[in-house]
């Protein structure tokens, strides 16, 4: 396939969770591919660092400090991104971790995780789809699921439930938006070394990483750039016949088949 299929010159991408980790890697890579990127995150300092990385490499980035669980904030930012030309792609990456057993989980824990990890993605998809449909142009939406949708993990009820909801959202959107030439796919990463995973107990993190390395045929954990390349593929014309899929870059761990 010609490399031009991955050329995003003249296109506009909106990325949530762009202040660090997978979101930042996506923003940097899509900008390297030629896209103008609009970066959204609650962490304004991290956003500024992402924009600096993109600018220093010759790319174009715009920052939108916001809370993805607030629909009005996302709506305003996405409509602004579309007003600068058109919106071609969305990467809804923003998410949080929470650990508690089922019996320990409080209402506020579940509400907070669902607000960010599910509603935040739902809102971004809804508002992006609306402007894409209004423009009458093809588009690509990529949501961020997780390997947690394939295997139960003690202590991850809120996180796993939210990510499972994202999978069904993705499939439903793919069915509904296909007639508008808008593709919708999800990425379900395995263990990826990011600031979000680093914030958890260091000993537990080391144990989890060691376990993933043993389980992976590739004998390593993933890096944010591994996921960013998957997102680039799904955002580009190289995947023009791909929609409704859950792509699992996980080093061969937790193969559902």
Regions found by a protein language model. Give the residues of each.
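Short C-terminal tail/terminal secondary-structure segment
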Residues: 2-4, 151, 232, 243-257
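A glycine/serine/threonine-rich, flexible loop-to-helix segment
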Residues: 4, 179, 191-215, 256-257
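Substrate-binding pocket helix/loop in short-chain dehydrogenase/reductase
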Residues: 101-102, 106-114, 212
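Active-site helix of classical SDR
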Residues: 125, 162, 170
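Alpha-helical segment proximal to the catalytic Tyr-Lys
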Residues: 130, 175-179, 240
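Residue(s) in the substrate-gating loop at a strand-loop-helix junction
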Residues: 146
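C-terminal helical subdomain
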Residues: 186, 210-238, 242, 251
């Amino acid at each position: 396939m010609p490399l031009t299929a991955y050329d995003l010159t003249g296109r506009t991408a909106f990325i949530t969770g762009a202040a660090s980790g997978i979101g930042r890697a996506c923003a940097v890579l899509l900008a390297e591919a030629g896209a103008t990127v609009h970066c959204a995150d609650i962490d304004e300092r991290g956003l500024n660092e992402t924009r600096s990385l993109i600018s220093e490499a010759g790319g174009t980035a715009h920052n939108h400090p916001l809370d993805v669980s607030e629909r009005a904030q996302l709506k305003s930012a996405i409509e602004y991104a579309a007003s600068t030309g058109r919106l071609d792609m969305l990467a809804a990456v923003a998410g949080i971790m929470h650990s508690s057993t089922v019996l320990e989980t409080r209402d506020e824990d579940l509400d907070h995780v669902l607000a960010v990890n599910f509603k935040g993605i739902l809102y971004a998809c809804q508002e992006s789809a609306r402007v894409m449909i209004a423009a009458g142009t093809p588009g690509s939406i990529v949501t961020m699921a997780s390997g947690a949708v394939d295997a139960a993990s003690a202590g991850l009820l809120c996180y796993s439930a939210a990510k499972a909801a994202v999978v069904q959202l993705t499939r439903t959107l793919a069915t509904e938006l296909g007639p508008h030439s808008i593709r919708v796919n999800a990425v379900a990463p395995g263990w990826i070394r990011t600031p979000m995973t680093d914030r958890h107990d260091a000993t537990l993190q080391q144990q989890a990483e060691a376990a993933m390395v043993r389980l992976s045929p590739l004998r390593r954990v993933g890096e944010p750039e591994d996921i960013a390349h998957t997102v680039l593929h799904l955002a580009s014309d190289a995947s023009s016949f791909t929609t409704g899929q859950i792509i699992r870059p996980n080093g061969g761990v937790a193969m559902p088949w």
